[in-house]
Design a protein with these regions (language model features):
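An N-terminal assembly and electron-transfer interface module characteristic of large anaerobic redox
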Residues: 2-374
């Protein structure tokens, strides 16, 4: 934007006051705290007199390693600009130009096409726009390299001084002090260094396969960070999740499995707008005490994480093994059973969900999982 001669104005740092500014337009109490905060940030920009707000819907991140099946953003990150557009009345009242184009950070051609359409009223030439996009990607890459370099510097310091480090693993917005409530300070206060998952995930060379589908860029960072931590005797991992995040119900179980393969401690901390850290402080001190007890314990590097999957073989198909299919949509699934049977699979769609099915599901599914999973 600076290259294109725009004056860039950012909203203030997140705070409880910012959160309260937007509380009236939040449509769902169950959405995560970072999403709730965005309402306050938009209201803050409106109060500053900003007449043009750019809040893109980023559906795809960049693919950061070859093991990823895809590179989506979470549905909330992808679609929340639409929620803002339809719920923040002050955008219309103050005649704000609100732009939220859907963008794919992994495809520079579509980035150019979308931004050209977005900025056509500003008279920006194709040459100027292409140069600005290239510069932006260069800055993004340099930022990634800077973070990775800092991570490697901290790791070298820990090894040299025989210290313990904690990888505070989460999503990019968990770096926001208002969202993490100063959790990193609690950890350093116990004499341990803090690293982020994206400062070490590039160092993992072991993780090849997962139990879950690896199609989210930020999830992939967590998995590779966990794999790297599992191979380092002086590192531990704490996963940070926001209340209401259904996707992290998946990552929490997978990260725990990766760490447990080498008997590493898995610590999960859930946070929301509440800033009382008493219980969290106790958990960190307990982690520190456990680490001290295991100080001289060696890691068996021969124990690599291998997901347990049940294959469906051609022999099973030929022997007419039954495939049970949960009822997800009565309108569509009435055709699924017949279509699969015509294709040679003995598939049975389960009956519609009742109270008993829900209660049974709750016994086996992560508490944060969405209702269809249960």
């Amino acid at each position: 934007f600076t290259d294109l001669k725009f004056r860039v104005v950012l909203s203030p740092r997140s705070s409880k006051k910012i959160y309260e500014k937007g509380i009236e337009s939040i449509p769902s109490e169950s959405v995560c705290y970072p999403a709730k905060l965005s309402h306050g940030h938009i209201e803050s920009l409106i109060e500053k007199g900003i007449k043009y707000i750019f809040y893109p819907s980023v559906a795809y991140e960049r693919k950061e390693n070859v093991t990823q099946g895809n590179h989506y953003n979470c549905p909330v990150v992808t679609s929340y600009p639409e929620v803002i557009r339809n719920n923040v009345d002050n955008l219309e009242t103050n005649e704000i130009i609100f732009r939220n184009p859907f963008m794919d950070l992994s495809n520079r051609k579509t980035m150019f096409t979308n931004l050209k359409d977005e900025f056509k009223s500003f008279g920006i030439s194709d040459k100027e726009l292409k140069a600005a996009i290239e510069h932006a990607y260069e800055e993004l890459q340099q930022c990634r390299l800077d973070i990775q370099g800092e991570g490697e510097t901290v790791l070298a310091y820990l090894k040299e001084n025989n210290m313990t480090g904690v990888v505070l693993s989460g999503r990019p917005y968990h770096v926001d002090p208002e969202i993490n409530h100063g959790l990193a300070d609690l950890i350093t206060g116990e004499g341990m260094a803090v690293l982020t998952e994206d400062s070490v995930c590039h160092l993992d060379k072991e993780l090849e396969e997962l139990r879950v589908v690896d199609q989210w860029t930020y999830h992939s960072r967590m998995y590779h960070a966990a794999s790297f931590v599992s191979s380092q005797p002086n590192l531990q991992l704490i996963q940070l999740t926001s209340f209401g995040c259904g996707l992290d119900a998946v990552t929490a179980d997978q990260v725990a499995e990766i760490l447990n393969a080498r008997n590493k401690i898995y610590t999960l901390i859930k946070i929301d707008e509440g800033s009382n850290l008493g219980a969290i402080r106790i958990r960190i001190r307990s982690l520190k005490a456990t680490i001290d007890k295991q100080e001289n314990k060696e890691i068996d590097l021969s124990k690599k994480y291998k997901p347990v999957k049940v294959p469906f073989t051609k022999e099973m198909k030929d022997d007419r093994w039954t495939i049970l299919c949960p009822q997800m949509s009565p309108i569509h699934f009435q055709f699924v059973e017949k279509a699969m049977q015509e294709s040679g699979y003995n598939l049975k769609v389960l009956p519609s969900v009742d109270k008993g099915a829900t209660e049974a599901g709750l016994k086996y599914v992560n508490n944060d999982a969405c209702y269809p999973s249960i």
